[in-house]
Amino acid sequence: MKFTNLNNLSLVKLFLKVLVFVAVIFNVHAAEIDLNKILPMDNKITYGKLDNGVTYYVKNNQIPKNKAYVELVIKAGSLHENDDQQGLAHLLEHMAFNGTKSFPKNKIDSYLNSLGLSIGADFNASTGFTKTIYKFQVPTNTIEPLDTGVHILSEIASELTLEDEAFERERKIVEEEWRMDLGKFDRILEQQKPYIFKNSKYLVRDPIGKMEVIRNFKYQTAKDYYHQWYRPELMVVFIIGDIDQKKAEQIACELALHLLLQYN
């Protein structure tokens, strides 16, 4: 591109000078950072690791008022899939919305609606290369929603119903998600991936998976992934919000106890 206008040329020169300045400053500060130094824990956070391996973090944060954010992290994602499981970490995340032992079918949705909450806005999930995250936002003007929300997460971690008809529904939903991601930007990114992820497993483990696998996987193959990677020592629980910190810690420990009973 040619810049014939002097004002445009001046702007380009100014931009380049700023870019160089920022790069120099960044390098100076980067040189001062010890990347091996462990960051200190915020002393306002209560945390612990229980005997069954579950780690928890609890923090009181009064903004916004009367709300808490609860998150269950499974330290496994698409990089942990076998070749015949590509896309099943993500599909299993979808299965959490199809029922657990105490909340079969659409009972989770019904419970949320009774609190004025909804799937998507207040209960959601995501799957990445190295982790799968389930997250709740609940009111805390009474303790029951927080208690029940954590109980639902504990059942997602160990007692998904994984019914055949739900698997069939989710095949179609995941394929539709894949189809919606076939836009211009995504096609460009697809062309760049061999250069970005060269000689890396990231290149062949996109969380959306392979549609050949999604269309044809056996139910047991998905269940095998669930039982292999949804283990207490790979789970982290976060409870943050306008809460009684000791009570929230007790609830986190109850979740871990529930998992201990399920895995023994």
Give the label of every model feature segment.
Residues A31-T46, P194-M235, Q245:
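Histidine-acidic residue clusters that define the catalytic metal-binding segment
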Residues I38-E71:
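Mature N-terminal segment immediately following signal peptide/propeptide cleavage
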Residues T55-K59, Y69-V73, I133-Q137, V236-F238:
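Soluble periplasmic/extracytoplasmic beta-strand elements of cell-envelope proteins
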Residues T140-I143, D242-K246:
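Helix N-cap motif at beta-to-alpha junctions
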Residues I74-A89, H94-D186, K223-L234, I251-E254:
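Active-site-adjacent, His/Asp/Glu-enriched structural segments that form or flank metal-binding
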